[in-house]
């Protein structure tokens, strides 16, 4: 952003009084790093700490941020404010030092709310689909020439980053319900994609508490704001009478204000018609597979239509949509040397989905787009508590693939729970009689086990939210070699 653009932005968005140096504890996370990137581009001095470098910290370093790969008290002593990730505990030495020095310590969402305070905020919430929907809204606004600021939980491929500072009044952001911190946000427009029982430790195991929290989030909208909600979701349909704001619904349902009709899929593209409240139609080609992505697009179109964005810009953005990292992320089609000496090709897809509903949507999208391919899934369960709470759903959904290789549970800091481990889950799936899952307890054995499982012309789904994304890249870079045409 040049000096003239920054000056224009300053006329829209005032500086935070007395704040010059902002320190982030846990800066390597996508959400934290995205906010840090926007603030760095606004001219604030940025520092932060994390345990190891990654793409997020590398990008921030290029922008002039000081990154420490350790947690020490001295890291925060010159900061005006400390922003803390929800993964950081209160006994972290930087948090303790900040409190001792009377430096304000705030959560990530509080800083996001501050960015949103003087902007036209569009917040995307829901159990599933937040990241992709945020990217779709961003893509449409960018295509329309509105140059929005955005902060997303996943890398927006078209932009090559999780976040970017725009020159307009629009801020598009993913809103995180996992720790209820989205209640800090006060947007003008809020999308809710769906509501399911997840992160229930935050809500004391009470689903009614979770539902009421979403209603409270929507009531942060001004009375002239807009709630955009998926009416296909049974919980959202139940909650509609309790939402005291203007509502636009979307979905496949006949009574949706923005209705998806005639969906079909060819490869990675979805084709469908959107029927809007004013009876106008949009014939959409969406460069993202699956009925769930058609719903995400309908939400984005509802917001864009309300803003008055031209239909042609909407259609161009959706047809050119490049997606986000680790959301049905096509890593290439590669030749394979199989153990029987034959050759073949495998399509490699990396996907972040780690809840049964998300995994089911990925499987359905793969089946619809590539009906002749076998589905070979490498799955890493995420958290023992989620595996325990959704055990039967996982067993059902994972039984739908043709071959399943299951890694050990990615604990995310949790202690093991008896009966909520990968071995138990494999045993239960095997007992259903559809497939015989392969338990992978040693990652070094995975390439050989995968070679034995593949027949050629397969579709490999690398699925999960832990460190399995690194495995997908490793497979793409080493085990599977790109075909070289002569």
Curated annotation (Swiss-Prot):
It is found in: Cytoplasm. It comes from Pectobacterium atrosepticum (strain SCRI 1043 / ATCC BAA-672) (Erwinia carotovora subsp. atroseptica). The lineage of its organism: Bacteria, Pseudomonadati, Pseudomonadota, Gammaproteobacteria, Enterobacterales. It catalyses: UDP-N-acetyl-alpha-D-muramate + L-alanine + ATP = UDP-N-acetyl-alpha-D-muramoyl-L-alanine + ADP + phosphate + H(+). Keywords: ATP-binding, Cell cycle, Cell division, Cell shape, Cell wall biogenesis/degradation, Cytoplasm, Ligase, Nucleotide-binding, Peptidoglycan synthesis. Pfam families: Mur_ligase, Mur_ligase_C, Mur_ligase_M. Its main location: cytoplasm. Pathway: Cell wall biogenesis; peptidoglycan biosynthesis. Belongs to the MurCDEF family. It is an enzyme of class 6 (ligase). The keyword Cytoplasm applies. The keyword Nucleotide-binding applies. This is UDP-N-acetylmuramate--L-alanine ligase. InterPro entries: Mur-like_cat_sf, Mur_ligase_C, Mur_ligase_C_dom_sf, Mur_ligase_cen, Mur_ligase_N, MurCDEF_pg_biosynth, UDP-N-AcMur_Ala_ligase_MurC. ATP binds at residues 126-132. It comes from the Bacteria.
């Amino acid at each position: 952003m040049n000096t003239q653009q920054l000056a224009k932005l300053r006329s829209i968005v005032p500086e935070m009084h007395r704040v010059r140096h902002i320190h982030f504890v846990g800066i390597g996370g996508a959400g934290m790093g995205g906010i840090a990137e926007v603030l760095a581009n606004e001219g604030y001095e940025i520092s932060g700490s994390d345990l190891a470098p990654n793409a997020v910290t590398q990008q921030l370093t290029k922008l002039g941020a000081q990154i420490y790969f350790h947690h020490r008290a001295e890291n925060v002593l010159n900061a005006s404010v400390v922003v803390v990730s929800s993964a950081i505990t209160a006994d972290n030495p930087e948090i303790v030092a900040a409190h001792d020095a009377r430096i304000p310590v705030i959560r990530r969402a509080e800083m996001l709310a501050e960015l949103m305070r003087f902007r036209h905020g569009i917040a995307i919430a829901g159990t599933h689909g937040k990241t992709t929907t945020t990217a779709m809204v961003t893509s449409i606004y960018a295509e329309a020439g509105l140059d929005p600021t955005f902060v997303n939980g996943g890398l927006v491929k078209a932009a090559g980053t999780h976040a970017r500072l725009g020159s307009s009044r629009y801020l598009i952001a993913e809103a995180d319900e996992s720790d209820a911190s989205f209640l800090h946000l006060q947007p003008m427009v809020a999308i809710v994609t769906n509501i399911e029982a997840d992160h229930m430790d935050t809500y004391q195991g009470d689903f009614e508490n979770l539902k009421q929290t979403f209603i409270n989030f929507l009531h942060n909208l001004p009375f002239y704001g807009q709630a955009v909600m998926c009416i296909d979701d049974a919980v959202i349909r139940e909650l509609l009478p309790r939402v005291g704001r203007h509502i636009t619904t979307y979905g496949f349902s006949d009574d949706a204000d923005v209705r998806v009709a005639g969906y079909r899929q060819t490869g990675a593209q979805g084709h469908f018609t959107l029927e809007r409240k004013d009876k106008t139609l949009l014939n959409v080609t969406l460069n993202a597979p699956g009925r769930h992505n058609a719903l995400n697009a309908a939400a984005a179109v509802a917001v864009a239509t309300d803003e008055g964005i031209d239909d042609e810009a909407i259609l161009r953005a959706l047809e050119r949509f490049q997606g986000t990292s680790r959301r049905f992320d096509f890593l290439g089609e590669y030749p394979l040397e199989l153990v029987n000496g034959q050759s073949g090709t495998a399509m490699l897809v990396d996907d972040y989905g780690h809840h049964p509903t998300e995994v089911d949507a990925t499987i359905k999208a793969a089946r619809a787009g590539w009906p002749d391919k076998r589905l070979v899934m490498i799955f890493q369960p995420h958290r023992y508590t989620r595996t325990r709470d959704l055990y039967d759903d996982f067993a059902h959904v994972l039984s739908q693939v043709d071959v399943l290789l299951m890694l050990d549970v990615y604990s995310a800091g949790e202690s093991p729970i008896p009966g909520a481990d990968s071995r138990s889950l494999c045993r239960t799936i095997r007992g259903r009689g559809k497939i015989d899952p392969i338990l992978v307890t040693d990652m070094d054995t995975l390439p050989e086990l995968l070679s034995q499982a593949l027949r050629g012309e397969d579709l490999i789904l690398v699925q999960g939210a832990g460190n399995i994304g690194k495995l997908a890249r490793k497979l793409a870079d080493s085990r599977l070699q790109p075909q070289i045409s002569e």
